[in-house]
Amino acid sequence: MKNIATVILFLLTFSNVVMAEYSQGSILKNSLSYQATITRDIWGVPHVYGKRDEDAAFGLAFAHADDDIKNIAENMYLYRAQMGLKEGFKGAVTDYLIKALKIHSLIDENYHSSLSEDVREVLEGYVAGLNYWNEINVNHNYKSLFPITVRDVLTGFVIQNLYFSGVVTEIEKLQDGRYQQKSDQNSLQTRFYDGYKNILGSNAIAVSSFKTDDESTRLVINSHQPLDGPVAWYEAHIKSDEGWNMMGGTFPGSPFIFVGFNENIGWGLTVNKPDLTDVYELEINSTNENQYLLDEKWIPFKESLVRLPVKILGPIKWTFKRQFRESVHG
C-alpha cells in the first residue's frame, strides 16, 4: 500500500516577463493561477500531476524545494556569478568565467527567439513553484536568495553544459600551464592520447523482457553523480493531461527529468568526454600587447570590464574590477 499524502497547490503568480523584478508581495498578489497535486509513495518519492505542463512543473518545484531547498538555493550563488560572496576569492574565479562568457546576456537576448512558448511556460511555472514555496515557508536559511528567476534556472543549464562538455577542464589546463606554447606534431598526438587515458564515465544497461526470467524489462542507470551539490539526482514522477509523463532523476533547479522512463521508453545519461572544445594559441604583437595576429593583420582585442563582489572577512565585502579581452574566436 502506498502511504499517500495529497497536497493541492494554488498560486496567483507573476506576469510572463522573464527577467522581471520580483517582489515578495507580487508573487502572491499578481497574475496567473497554477494548480498541481503532489502524492508521495512509501519511499517519499513525489508523484506530481497537473492539467497543464506548467502546472506539473509548478508542483515539481514545490516538492523539490520541500525536500532539498539547500541544494536548489545554494545553486543561485553560482548561477548569479556570486560565488565570491560565498567562498571569497576562490569563488570569484568562477564568477569571472561566467561573466566573461556573457552567459546572462546570452540568455536575455535569446530567451524568446530560441525557446518555444511551451518550454517558456514550463520554465515560468517551475520558477513560480519555487517562489511560492518560499512565500509559505518563513523559517528557512535561504530567504536572501529569493525570489528565483527564469534566468537563474536557464543559467544552470548553460553552466552544466560547460562542465559536461569539457570547457572548464580545458580552461584549468591553460591555468595550470599544461598547454605548451609551441607544439610539434608528436606532442599534439601525445596530448591527444593522454586525454583519453583512464576515462571513467557513466553507463546505462537495458535488458529486454526476452532475456529475463520473469519477462520484465529492466533499465539500470548508473550515472556517477554526487549525492550532494548542483548535480545531485532528485527522483520524481511528473505527469500532465497534455501528454507529459516521466519518472526519473533531475538536478536541483531543473523542471525536466534527465534520466528515467515513461510508459514507452527508458533512457540514461552518460558523459563520454567528446572533444568539443578548441583552444587557439594567439600571436601577440610585441609592440602592442592589446593586438593579436589574424590573417596577417594585427587586430585589437575587444575589452570589457567585469565587477566581482567578494567576501573578504565576515560581513566585509568588496567589489573588484577586472578587464577581460576577447578575440574573434571568443
Positions of the model-derived regions?
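Substrate-recognition/specificity elements adjacent to catalytic centers across diverse enzyme folds
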Residues: E21-P230, D241-G243, M247-T250, S254-F256, ...
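Sec-dependent N-terminal signal peptides
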Residues: I4-F14
